[in-house]
Amino acid sequence: MTEPNRARKTRQRTAFAAPDQRTAPRRGALALRPLVFAVAGVWTAASAAQSQGATQQAASAQAPSSAASVTALAVSGPTTPGGAPLVPKMAEPVKRPDNAVPSFAAADAMDGRTNEDIHLRGHGELRRNGTVVKGDTLDYNQDTDFATATGNVRLFRDGTLVTGPDAALKVTANEGTMHTPSYEFHTVGGRGSAERIDFIDKDNSRITKGTYTTCSPDNVDWYFSASQIDIDSDRQVGSGRAGVLHFLGMPVFASPVFDFPLNDERRSGFLAPVFGYSSRSGADVTLPYYFNIAPNRDLTLYPRLLSQRGLQLGAEYRYLSQTYNGVLRGEFLPNDREADRNRWSIALVHNQRLATGLNAYVNYNKVSDSTYPDDLGRSIVTATQRQYTQEGGVTYSIGDWVALARVQKFQTLSTATTALSPPYERVPQLNLSYNRYDVGGFDINFQTDYTKFSIPTENTVQGERLFMQPTISYPIIRPGWFVTPKFILNTTSYRLDRPTGDTQASQINRTLPTVSLDSGLTFERDTPLVSKWFGRSYIQTLEPRLFYVYTPFRDQSQIPLFDTAQSDYNLGQIFTENPYTGYDRIADNNKLTAGVTTRFIESETGIERLRATLAQRLDFEGQRVTLAGSAPTSVRRYSDLLGATTIQMFRGIFFDTNLQYNQDIDRIMRSTMAFSWKPDANKVINLGYRYYRADANTGQLALEQTDISAQWPLTRRLYGLGRIGYDMDAKKPSDMLLGFEYVADCWVGRLAVQRYSNATSGYTTHIFAQIEFKGLSKVGNNPIDVIRLNVPGYQPVTAQPVTPSVLDQYE
């Protein structure tokens, strides 16, 4: 609020103590310059140009005998020739209880009776105990602490400003009434108006026929109205009756009773409804109810109505303590009208600290049938899940030792069009590892693992496996080069239960040593030409690397594959000792891998702007160990050539490519490319390409796909986003997403449609629609997680409120 002109001749300021702090008066004097004086605990600062009546009143004023009963005003006054003030600076007041807190008054003109009341005329202002009352006229009774104000009344307390034509209240007790008020909550940026507001006490108030919005006054796109709203500042909660949400001039939601928090603390009550649509289930409406059981426990019930299937009941219970935490979630759909059976799911994640270094955990997930995620999943993430883990275990760590004991099972979902074989279950697995670095320059590692494997498939080998692997290496790292010799001993013992008719050995022992030598050099140079092109100083590196590994051949064709698969062939795998995961296959090796990397690094920041790598492996003898156990159909001396490049030379531009090239057949076996341009916030364009050539040796299926995704502003407030993935082999889209976001100063609207192929050789379509009312709630089905998954670099737009002035909250 603009402060009235301080040069007004009648502008007066007064500070007076509480009635019970009055002291005996004494005579005072009047100075030509502004001075401070008091009458029975009342100080007044007046200018020399005061009216004659005001001057006479000031001349007869008296000062208190004790400075402790008053509060000083910062007023400039006359000084002696030596610079000492004629009016001495008053001591800092001692803290008083609320009933003894001083009051401050200011107005163009004031009058009143000593120790009884004061009348303010023209820009009246009263301050007491954190409350500010302003009005054209203001009357205040010191004995009753009662104030009445009329004309442009402003009441400010604890970050809340209430304005209206009149007000009557007890200032300290915050008891009173204001008619046709408007209010602003500066801490949350909300505002509204009402027919009446009653201040019940310091913590409670009641709003009659009130509204609330976070929109600017000249653009109220939405507001919430209610016949009655009760505010409890102590509990930081509000409640009301007959609430209606209006959006763009239309009522869109109503509730007979409601409650809401005044801060970020959790409160029990209904959450915003979630709306959606799925081609497999129809219209989808969820109305969650939240129970704030305790600060460390809560429960959410979420009944979900599916128009084509029925009513699904769901619940999620969360708990947390110093020694444990977890989440229990369950869903139940009785008598699904489409499937004609009950559908359900359950999930439990629990973590427990039993003692120092000793922890336990449970991760259990199960669904009623194989099509549950397709029919009832809310997004492509859940709809494509085909394996559910059911696991529990204990871990213990002390020093360099780590132990694990667990039982791990799986639920595998197979459909008529997607037949999946279940993996082996670990019932149980016991694992012990030891890691110690720099023991006289040596790094020591020891792994031992015992697992009993079981599988719910008939006529399939099962059994037990004991694996031990000590490793010792001696890294020699110097500026510009490194050499790391390593020795590994792989020892494995099997005891197998083979199906009837299988005559292979039931007990197998295997011991294989492995030696490797890893080495590399690093050269650096300045690049004045590149630095000139890009306007920055760059350093280029050249980093050649050689890696040799030797493992003798051992026939492993009789060993089953419990948990072993071919590692993905890439620049990380080509510099390792074994191309297989798990412990069931140890490849015979007599191989040398050569690679070279060059990097461009900004000299000042150390940011890597470009990296390019080439690598290839030379096989001196030809690997004979395969996953199938049979000898390979052909032996290759040279592996596929691997290349990779990452470039981010320009602001917001990123390019990455990987290539796998087979020299023997002169064919590209694998190629991936990714391009991203992100010039600014909420602006991104992504291009992607993936090509995999069919390979019988690795089981790789042919694949060729491309995709494009983007988020881009179409207007100042409207943003478009989308993605399309195209299968070039099938000549049809594999997945699509199209969406829009509209951002206003107090709300954001989001609409997205997603379509993807499902496990039954069809397509599933989801529609997401959400409106986010700033400072109130979100209504609809949140598409943000789905968009983030489909559009890399996506940033949700947020409401753009009018930037407040630094003086907006000044009273």
UniProtKB/Swiss-Prot annotation:
Disordered, as annotated region: 1-22
Family listed: Belongs to the LptD family.
CC terms in the record's Gene Ontology section: cell outer membrane; transporter complex
GO biological process terms on file: Gram-negative-bacterium-type cell outer membrane assembly; lipopolysaccharide transport
Record function comment: Together with LptE, is involved in the assembly of lipopolysaccharide (LPS) at the surface of the outer membrane.
UniProt protein name: LPS-assembly protein LptD
Organism name: Ralstonia nicotianae (strain ATCC BAA-1114 / GMI1000)
Pfam families: LptD
Keywords: Cell outer membrane, Membrane, Signal
Cell compartment(s), UniProt: Cell outer membrane
InterPro entries, sorted: LipoPS_assembly_LptD, LptD, LptD_C
Signal sequence range: 1-17
Assembly and oligomerization: Component of the lipopolysaccharide transport and assembly complex. Interacts with LptE and LptA.
Chief subcellular location: membrane
